[in-house]
């Protein structure tokens, strides 16, 4: 059952990958990234804050509710993450005064750094506190990335 959160996250990313381009065409990349990041990060964080205490009770009903809430949180996080990288790549290519190749290279370096630093920081926080607290860090990072996405230019 614990793998269901990863399955929800992955399924959400697949669905969102097929719909994100249409949403960005209709509403603009800045709005999609902002709302995806802020709402996805907030739901993910809230699901952890609510579900973890619920799961620590002896009640089967509470454990099932906690499982459903965690899956909703991971699903929301997956949907919020997907449009970010393509939108930031396109945005980096449109920065005035910077060649598109340089902007894209910078975003790629930031992405690779996040790939290595994100899990490392999450693990460090987990060692210092506990795993539910550590999972608040990526939720916060998703919210920050969503806010940073407000600077994207749609035209």
Model-derived segments and spans:
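Alpha-helical transmembrane segments of multi-pass secondary-active solute transporters
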Residues: 2, 32, 103, 125, ...
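Helix-to-loop junctions at the C-terminal end of transmembrane segments
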Residues: 16-29, 126
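C-terminal transmembrane helical hairpin of 12-TM major facilitator-type secondary transporters
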Residues: 30-88
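Multi-pass alpha-helical transporter architecture, strongest
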Residues: 139-155
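Residue-level signature of mid-helix packing/kink "hotspots" within the transmembrane helices
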Residues: 10-18, 115-116
């Amino acid at each position: 059952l614990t793998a269901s959160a990863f399955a929800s996250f992955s399924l959400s990313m697949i669905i969102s990958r097929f719909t994100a381009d249409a949403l960005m065409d209709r509403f603009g990349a800045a709005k999609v990234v902002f709302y995806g990041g802020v709402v996805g990060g907030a739901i993910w964080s809230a699901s952890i804050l609510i579900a973890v205490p619920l799961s620590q009770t002896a009640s089967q009903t509470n454990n099932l509710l906690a499982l459903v809430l965690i899956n909703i949180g991971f699903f929301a996080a997956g949907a919020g993450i997907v449009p970010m990288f393509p939108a930031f790549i396109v945005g980096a290519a449109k920065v005035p005064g910077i060649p598109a190749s340089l902007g894209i290279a910078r975003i790629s370096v930031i992405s690779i750094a996040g790939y290595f630093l994100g899990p490392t920081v999450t693990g460090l926080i987990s060692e210092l506190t506990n795993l539910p607290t550590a999972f608040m860090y990526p939720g916060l990072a998703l919210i920050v990335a969503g806010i940073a996405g407000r600077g994207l230019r749609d035209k």
